[in-house]
Amino acid sequence: MRRSLSDLIDQGRGKAPADLVLKNGRIFDLVTGELVQTDVAICGDRIVGTFGTYEGRREIDCRGRILVPGFIDTHLHVESSLVTPFEFDRCVTPRGITTAICDPHEIANVCGLEGIRYFLEAAEHLVMDLRVQLSSCVPSTHMETAGATLEAADLVPLMDHPRVIGLAEFMNFPGVLAKDAGCLAKLEAFRGRHIDGHAPLLRGKDLNGYIAAGIRTEHEATTAEEALEKLRKGMRVLIREGSVSRDLEALVPLLTERHSPYLCLCTDDRNPLDIAEHGHIDHMIRTAIRLGAPPLAVYRAASLSAAEAFGLKDRGLIAPGKRADVVALDSLEGCHAGLVVAGGVVVDAGAFAARGTVEPVARASVRVAPVEAAAFRCPGNRAETPVIGILPGKIITEHLTDAIEPVDGDKRPDPSRDLARIAVIERHGRNGGRAVGFVRGFGMRRGAIASTVCHDHHNLAVVGVDYADMALAANRLREIEGGFAVAAEGEILAELALPVGGLMSLRPFEEVRDALVALREAARGLGVTLEEPFLQLAFLALPVIPHLKITDRGIVDVDRFEILP
């Protein structure tokens, strides 16, 4: 789609017909805030003409629709959509997301550089522009067992790849502050390049030190106060609205025309059911405006501010010389895409059909011995017990304690007190490690659920109140190469196979969406009250998010950054 300078100049001047002209649209100018009736002329993958009338080899009547720049998701894990990059492309690009900046650390935690290279190769074939941040924390800490370890020397050979922006979210903020040698080696290798942050609840001088290490952007702010401190200290704040982490409403008071040059939008982890039912970045735009944010501020955060934050200077405006990423909307408030152009390509079934393919990686990645019911016993002779407390809609958890008397040497789950057993079993074939504990907040009255989506090490996680059902669900995931399963009374009630690394399906996103509906219904039948129980479960194993978590190595006190005895 790259055209000669001569063609760009001639088509921009109207001396030659443009390759594509969007006629009768109204540009929403993100610099001035004006709505202006005009044609948009496109040559190859570039916009060459605005604020004038043009003729084109192909012309599309926009019928008065509002034209805005393509949306940019500034931080996400494609794997959390539970489909391959190709299906993710087909799922979200028609909604106006023309650029996505991904951190493939989910697949990297399973198969290392092979997973990152898979994303880089896939990105060459997509309709959207998928950019990659190199995964900085694989594993996220020393308190878990992943399928791979990536050091600075592993990442440096990929840093100049044209699809790579920089270093992905640096989750091990305690390691940065402690000047851990491995952390400093990665930061030094990417010094002067874009380094994305991840520092939940980090404040004061500790935050200063973290930022001073060269970290520029951050998406973990969950309150306006936290986000404002990060803005004041020069960070670009990425407002997040995922399937579990829902921070938009809390941060929307900051989404003003004054702050919008330093704010972006991201989804982080969003599954295809939520995308189908509610949307993606388009959902965030609608929601923010409904909550009172000015449309100019919101659309800036969705495109122009995002482009500038990540050094993508060729996009973010509908203007000559910019990448031809254009979304035609019914209204600014409705944000429903009637037409999407991505890099000069009209997004339709033909565009997706014309893509190349890449062979998936990390098959047969669930390497764990058969699980017995007795594996879920929790021995102990002391009643005082740490309990992970779920906060619905948050990935931060509470560090609770409860008196749980052992029975025959086993501290057992108690549905009447909303105390379920949680277990994480190492599944990469490394050491066979296993840890068990308690979680409150699922509301589970019977059965079990299991998942190999278990951030970020992606071991096998199980929650239940019946040990036999927990073993049944875990063993079913061994058989189907990973995924999700719901079990009760000795039967599998629902499942979704995720054979690509135990993370992604090979099925169309519509089928994955339908399977998620069945899984949620089955989980509700167990008494589960959480809207998104599987992603909520996944984040209970992430030891870089306060306050209490569990990995295959034990119960983790995140505030003290240590495994409890």
From Swiss-Prot:
Its cofactor is Mn(2+). The keyword Hydrolase applies. The keyword Hydrolase applies. Its EC number is 3.5.4.2. One of its GO terms (molecular function) is adenine deaminase activity. Keywords: Hydrolase, Manganese. It catalyses: adenine + H2O + H(+) = hypoxanthine + NH4(+). It is an enzyme of class 3 (hydrolase). One of its GO terms (biological process) is adenine catabolic process. InterPro entries: Adenine_deam, Adenine_deam_C, Amidohydro-rel, Metal-dep_hydrolase_composite, Metal_Hydrolase. Disulfide bonds: none annotated. HAMAP family: Adenine_deamin. Belongs to the metallo-dependent hydrolases superfamily. Adenine deaminase family. This is Adenine deaminase. The lineage of its organism: Bacteria, Pseudomonadati, Pseudomonadota, Alphaproteobacteria, Rhodobacterales.
